[in-house]
């Protein structure tokens, strides 16, 4: 049935995964993945946001590095098939220092992928196994504004989780102009 087909024609996928594990255990220390799709013809049935409609898709990549026991950092990207433009950048990191956890995320989308560009961060404090206090925020670089603040308290036992969340969201009204 031709109407249910999304992909047809000749194509190939080229990619690799590389991993390094810690000595003495099976924990992944470093991982690297890279890939690209090659098609014999253009395929207009696939959305252009993915670049899979082109003869050569964007180069997709992902790198993860795990620090000893304190955290990790990851990087995901889309490199345009001309190898000149980064259409997607995402960096995320987590750090764990016992009862305190930090996270920081950065995202930038360009061209056919999207228009997002922001950083978000958070901190959590675990008082004990049942009580947790968290704060997070998100900064939008396109609008040069803070989008939200989140402050939460969570209490958790066996099969019950209760919490209180204060969330302050900021928005931009296109009809309002600053003084």
Residue positions per predicted region:
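Outer-membrane beta-barrel translocator/pore domains, especially the C-terminal barrels
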Residues: 1-154, 158-179
């Amino acid at each position: 049935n031709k109407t249910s087909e999304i992909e047809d024609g000749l194509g190939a996928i080229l990619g690799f995964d590389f991993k390094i594990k810690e000595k003495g255990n099976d924990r992944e220390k470093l991982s690297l993945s890279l890939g690209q799709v090659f098609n014999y013809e253009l395929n207009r049935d696939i959305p252009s946001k993915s670049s899979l409609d082109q003869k050569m898709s964007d180069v997709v990549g992902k790198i993860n590095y795990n620090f000893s026991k304190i955290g990790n950092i990851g990087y995901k990207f889309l490199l345009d098939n001309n190898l000149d433009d980064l259409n997607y950048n995402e960096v995320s990191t987590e750090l764990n220092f016992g009862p305190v956890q930090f996270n920081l995320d950065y995202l930038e989308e360009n061209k056919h992928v999207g228009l997002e560009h922001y950083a978000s961060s958070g901190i959590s404090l675990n008082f004990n196994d049942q009580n947790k206090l968290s704060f997070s925020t998100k900064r939008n670089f396109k609008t040069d504004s803070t989008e939200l603040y989140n402050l939460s308290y969570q209490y958790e036992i066996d099969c019950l989780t209760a919490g209180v969340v204060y969330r302050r969201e900021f928005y931009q009204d296109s009809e309002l102009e600053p003084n």
